[in-house]
């Protein structure tokens, strides 16, 4: 009898202890909320808007050269997918699936599928190392994850060059992306930390949120290369330093002080306010005034 009790107690202890090593199930269909940086993510950032970005001078110079016609003229840009760091902020649903170890039934990999550009990424949880620096770089990079309690921390390297914003702000192949995934009920929050020594002077921290939507379907994204604007072969629309006439529009539309619009690490901290004592906001909003969620951001003047 004592032996039976001991065995039963042992089994019960194992069941009670199991949740301590349990893994959070992130699988499902997740719909984006667009509650963070709505204008930047839905209609897209204005030209010259580098607010909130700890850019260095080289990145700012590169961004100033941007001409939106580049996408229409250079066909290779038209179907270029979002990279792993930007896919999280794009206009598309997210589907997460998992692979399980046959012996332990523990999750050994997550797979993400984002509708925009049909981006697919694998996040390995089996402890494998990242490849050497000279290994191939891709738009989704190489991702591994580790558990910290109920939080999954993901590290992604080997990213092809991409962009931080869709207004020409670049992101280099030296970038390293760290993500922290957490679930609260039916809400998924991902806090991302991007380090890029070629572009940023400090890490760039952003967050994105989704809600569980079982009825959602992340569909296909057919994309066709089409010459939209006539141009001579080999033309790449751009602006030389100091010649971009469109950078002033953002300052005028929103009455944003030029010192803040240019970005830089110092603009992220409260002490920077002391440099803006003469700043006076506009008396009333004139552009994207109702930009809350998706529908209210489709037009500068509202729905």
Regions found by a protein language model. Give the residues of each.
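Repetitive helical segments and hydrophobic/amphipathic motifs
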Residues: 11-13
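N-terminal signal peptide c-region/cleavage motif recognized by signal peptidases
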Residues: 17-19
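PEST-like low-complexity, intrinsically disordered acidic/proline/serine-rich tracts
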Residues: 22-303
């Amino acid at each position: 009898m004592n032996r039976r009790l001991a065995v039963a107690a042992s089994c019960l202890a194992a069941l009670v202890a199991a949740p301590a090593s349990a893994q959070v199930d992130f699988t499902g269909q997740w719909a984006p909320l667009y509650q963070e940086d709505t204008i930047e993510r839905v209609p897209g950032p204005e030209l010259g808007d580098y607010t909130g970005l700890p850019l260095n001078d080289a990145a700012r110079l590169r961004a100033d050269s941007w001409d939106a016609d580049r996408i229409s003229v250079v066909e290779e840009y038209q179907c270029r997918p979002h990279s792993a760091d930007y896919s999280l902020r794009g206009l598309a649903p997210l589907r997460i699936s998992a692979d399980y170890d046959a012996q332990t039934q523990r999750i050994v990999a997550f797979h993400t599928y984002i509708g925009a550009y049909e981006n697919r990424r694998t996040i390995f949880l089996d402890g494998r190392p990242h490849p050497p620096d000279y290994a191939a770089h891709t738009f989704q990079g190489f991702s591994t994850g580790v558990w910290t309690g109920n939080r999954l921390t993901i590290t992604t390297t080997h990213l092809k060059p991409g962009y931080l914003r869709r207004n020409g702000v670049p992101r280099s192949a030296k970038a390293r992306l760290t993500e922290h995934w957490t679930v609260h009920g039916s809400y998924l929050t991902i806090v991302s930390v991007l380090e890029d020594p070629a572009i940023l002077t400090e890490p760039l921290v952003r967050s994105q949120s989704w809600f569980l939507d079982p009825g959602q379907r992340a569909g296909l994204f057919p994309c066709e290369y089409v010459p939209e604007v006539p141009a001579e072969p080999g033309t790449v629309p751009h602006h030389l330093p100091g010649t971009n006439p469109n950078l002033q529009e953002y300052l005028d539309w929103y009455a944003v002080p030029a010192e803040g619009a240019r970005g830089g690490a110092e603009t992220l901290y409260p002490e920077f306010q002391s440099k803006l004592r003469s700043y006076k906001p506009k008396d009333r909003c004139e552009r994207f005034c109702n930009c809350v969620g998706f529908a209210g951001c489709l037009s500068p003047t509202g729905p």
